[in-house]
């Protein structure tokens, strides 16, 4: 593939990742669809998969940048001292650890079958629709009950509930953000607190998993120059776009419902299904 075209495609996918990673519309699902649309392929084994993990790291670094003050405080005050939602840095990260457990277990058990059977544009579109309907139902049933509950503390039970809901994100098209926010609603948290806890939860989950997968695949050293350039470009683009999106998303959540994202999911999914039936995928 021509180097310039390869880099241009990586820019588009970096934008897609940066926009969708923290919105409740499924970044993995969008990447699967756009990779198929653009024919994003490579002669190098596992390159496309590695590219996905690298741009996810770019998106997660946006969280680190935007929440660096809170992260630094929770690390420095690992023992007593009121930080973020918790009264101690230790408790805060312990809640994150608890929330990670269900997802890690499910990932180990179901990663292979999910990758084998659910990584197609049509299956993603179906899940986008089902997830959108679920979001509308969950918001109507749970969100309004928690509008005034701006809790500054996440309990072990709440963390475990959020972690359990995060397990659904293993299904391409479901969305980790949507799953954890709905889990936060069910646990009794406000939308903003649930979303910010979701951002912090993404740091160990996505950062750790992406790094492990990059190492497992074989690292970056054996890739041709064009592919290395595209990785760097995709990482930077995803980082910059995610920084802008996260700030706007939190501001949006304070004023408006998630229903608009649910409607977008369903409209986009219908377009994908029509394209699939017409033979574009």
Swiss-Prot record:
The chain crosses the membrane at residues 5-25, 48-68, 92-112, 118-138, 154-174, 192-212, 226-246, 261-281. GO terms for molecular function: undecaprenyl-diphosphatase activity. Bacitracin is thought to be involved in the inhibition of peptidoglycan synthesis by sequestering undecaprenyl diphosphate, thereby reducing the pool of lipid carrier available. Pfam families: BacA. The keyword Transmembrane applies. The gene is uppP. Its EC number is 3.6.1.27. It catalyses: di-trans,octa-cis-undecaprenyl diphosphate + H2O = di-trans,octa-cis-undecaprenyl phosphate + phosphate + H(+). The keyword Protein biosynthesis does not apply. HAMAP family: Undec_diphosphatase (MF_01006). Belongs to the UppP family. It comes from the Bacteria. Keywords: Antibiotic resistance, Cell membrane, Cell shape, Cell wall biogenesis/degradation, Hydrolase, Membrane, Peptidoglycan synthesis, Transmembrane, Transmembrane helix. Catalyzes the dephosphorylation of undecaprenyl diphosphate (UPP). Confers resistance to bacitracin. It is an enzyme of class 3 (hydrolase). It is found in: Cell membrane. This is Undecaprenyl-diphosphatase. GO terms for cellular component: plasma membrane. InterPro entries: UppP. It is a multi-pass membrane protein. It comes from Ruminiclostridium cellulolyticum (strain ATCC 35319 / DSM 5812 / JCM 6584 / H10).
């Amino acid at each position: 593939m021509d180097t310039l075209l390869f880099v241009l495609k990586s820019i588009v996918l970096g934008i897609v990742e940066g926009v969708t990673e923290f919105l409740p519309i499924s970044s993995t699902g969008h990447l699967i669809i756009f990779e198929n649309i653009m024919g994003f392929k490579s002669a190098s084994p596992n390159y496309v998969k590695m590219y996905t993990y690298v741009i996810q790291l770019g998106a997660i670094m946006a969280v680190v940048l935007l929440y660096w003050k809170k992260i630094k405080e929770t690390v420095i005050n690992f023992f007593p001292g009121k930080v973020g939602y918790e009264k101690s840095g230790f408790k805060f990260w312990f809640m994150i650890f608890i929330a990670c457990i269900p997802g890690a277990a499910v990932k180990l058990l179901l990663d292979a079958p999910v990758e084998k059977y659910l990584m197609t544009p049509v299956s993603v579109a179906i899940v986008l629709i089902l997830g959108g309907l679920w979001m509308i139902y969950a918001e109507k049933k749970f969100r309004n009950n928690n509008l005034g509950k701006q809790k500054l503390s996440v309990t072990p039970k709440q963390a475990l509930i959020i972690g359990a809901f995060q397990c659904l994100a293993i299904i391409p098209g479901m969305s980790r953000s949507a799953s954890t926010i709905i889990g936060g609603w069910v646990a009794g948290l406000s939308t903003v607190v649930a979303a910010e806890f979701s951002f912090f939860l993404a740091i160990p989950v996505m950062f750790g998993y992406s790094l492990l997968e990059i190492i497992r695949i074989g690292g970056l050293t054996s890739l041709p120059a064009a592919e290395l350039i595209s990785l760097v470009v995709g990482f930077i683009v995803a980082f910059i776009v995610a920084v802008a999106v996260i700030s706007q998303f939190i501001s949006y959540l304070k004023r408006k419902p998630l229903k608009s994202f649910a409607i977008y999911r369903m409209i986009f999914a219908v377009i994908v299904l029509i394209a699939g039936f017409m033979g574009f995928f």
